[in-house]
Amino acid sequence: CDVIIPLAALVGFPLCEKDKELATSINTTQIQNIVNVLSDDQKILYPNTNSGYGSRVDGMVTEEDELTPISHYGKTKCEAEDYIINESNGIVFRLATVFGGSSRMRTDLLANDFVYKLLTDRYITLFEHKFVRNFIHIQDVSRAFEFMIDNYYTFNNEVFNLGLSDENITKKQLVEKIQSHISDTSVNYSDYYVDPDKRDYIV
C-alpha cells in the first residue's frame, strides 16, 4: 500500500487502565512493528491524541511543548509518536476529542456521551465542569488526512495539533451548547464526584 493510517487502538482512559498490557501491545508495540517494516516509498500518518499534554494551567499548549501524559492511554500513544518521529519520516496529528456521526457510535467520547445522555435520560450529572477540552468534527479530521497525503513530502517528519481553536471549552460550556439544540433537559452540577480523567488544557 502507498499510505498507512494506523487507526486500530485501545482508546480512552477507562479502557486502557482496565488492561494496561493489552493497551501497550496494541497502541505502542504494533506501531513499532509497522514502522520497522515500512518500505522507503510508503507514507505513514499517525493519529495521536492531545491527551499527551496532560493537565496544564499555564496557557495554551503548542506542538513545541513537552508531552506529559497522565494516563496510560496517553503514555502508549506518545511512545508510539516518538518512535514514528525518530525511526521514520511520518506525519503525526495530535487529535482533539473527535465527535460526529458513525455507524458504530462511540459514546465514551465526551461530546457524544453528553448528547446521548441528554437525548435518552433528559438529564446529566456533571462534575469538575470547569475542566477545558478541545474538540474537532470527524469530517475535519478526514480533510486533514487527505491534505497531508497530497502534501506529504512538504510536511513529513512533523507533528501537528488538530483541533478547533474556538472549541477550547469547559465541560459546562459543552453541555450548554448541546442543550441549545435539545429541549427539556436538565443538568445537575455535582462537587461530590471527581473525574478520574484529569486532562485540562487549551490547545
Regions found by a protein language model. Give the residues of each.
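C-terminal substrate-binding subdomain of Rossmann-fold SDR/epimerase-dehydratase oxidoreductases
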Residues: 121-122, 126-203
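NAD(P)H-binding glycine-rich loop region in Rossmannoid oxidoreductase-like domains
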Residues: 1-25
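Short-chain dehydrogenase/reductase
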Residues: 22-24, 59, 65, 70-78, ...
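Structural signature of the Rossmann-like NAD(P)-dependent dehydrogenase/reductase core
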Residues: 6, 43-48, 52, 91-97, ...
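NAD(P)-dependent short-chain dehydrogenase/reductase
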Residues: 82-133, 138-147, 178
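Conserved Rossmann-fold NAD(P)-dependent oxidoreductase catalytic core, especially the SDR/UDP-sugar
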Residues: 6, 32-70
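Conserved catalytic-site region of short-chain dehydrogenase/reductase
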Residues: 13-14, 46-60, 72-78, 98-102
